[in-house]
Design a protein with these regions (language model features):
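Signature of the first transmembrane helix
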Residues: 1-19
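Alpha-helical transmembrane segments and their helix-entry boundary regions
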Residues: 10, 22, 136-138, 164-165, ...
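Transmembrane alpha-helical segments of multi-pass transport proteins
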Residues: 144-147, 194-242
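A helix-boundary/kink motif common to multi-pass secondary transporters
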Residues: 17-18, 55, 96, 133, ...
């Protein structure tokens, strides 16, 4: 699904915006794909195990694994997403150069799609596919594609690459919501959402701590590393307390 939306974004950017905007988007997209690959790998590893549990009718154990997976993936997803948002102002010009400073906004927007894609990954890889609910999965992807197409058509002409990034976030949100609705009568989605609220709050506190530093930070590697260490420390301490 992510590949579909990013491909759509690139095609529409090429047709409706400039080469510079395309470059900003592609650079930002690579970072997001790299950062979120651990979430994709987690889902791929867990799918055979969940398929075996469902085929054996072991619902209690499958629910336990899903709860553990949701907690683990969402802890990682919020740390990555809000961590990227926190340091993007320094990261973009340091990593790519001053000409790519606008990537900070695009990178931040794309990062917000990670929690949605992470939660949807658990539902898809550990419930929909193991239970043969391919139709619900395909429908969610179609709805996401339509949402992305609509959002891009409205936003890219006005906002360029940032508009495409926002369209991707909207699409991932729609996919996540559609998959949750597909399984709401079978599993307690609300309980999973409540358990992830803590990680969202921890991520926001991490973001707040880094933003305090960022107000006086210079665009140097040392300041970037300091922000990463402070943000990571705040998040890890809160996670341990949880």
């Amino acid at each position: 699904a992510v590949s579909l939306y990013t491909m759509m974004d690139k095609l529409m950017l090429g047709a409706m915006s400039t080469n510079a905007q395309m470059g900003f988007y592609e650079a930002s997209e690579r970072i997001i794909l790299c950062a979120s690959s651990v979430i994709t790998a987690f889902g791929t590893v867990m799918m055979p195990r969940m398929t075996k549990l469902f085929s054996d009718g072991d619902l209690r154990e499958s629910q336990r694994y899903m709860k553990l997976s949701v907690d683990a993936i969402m802890a990682i997803a919020f740390a990555i997403a809000l961590g990227i948002v926190s340091v993007s102002r320094l990261f973009a010009p340091i990593f790519w150069g001053e000409d790519f400073a606008p990537c900070a906004y695009i990178l931040s927007a794309l990062a917000l799609s990670i929690p949605f894609s992470g939660f949807a990954n658990v539902i898809r890889m550990q419930y929909l596919i193991p239970n043969g609910m391919d139709g619900a999965y395909i429908l969610s992807v179609i709805l996401g594609a339509v949402s992305n197409l609509t959002a891009n058509s409205l936003l890219i002409p006005r906002c360029g690459a940032l508009g495409a990034a926002v369209g991707t976030v909207i699409a991932e949100g729609v996919v996540c919501a559609a998959q949750c609705l597909a399984v709401k009568k079978r599993i307690d989605i609300l309980a999973y959402l409540k358990s992830t609220a803590f990680f969202g709050m921890a991520g926001l506190l991490m973001y707040g701590a880094v933003r305090v530093l960022d107000q006086r930070a210079e665009i140097t590697v040392s300041w970037l590393l300091l922000e990463i260490v402070v943000g990571g420390s705040v998040y890890c301490i809160l996670y341990v307390l949880y």
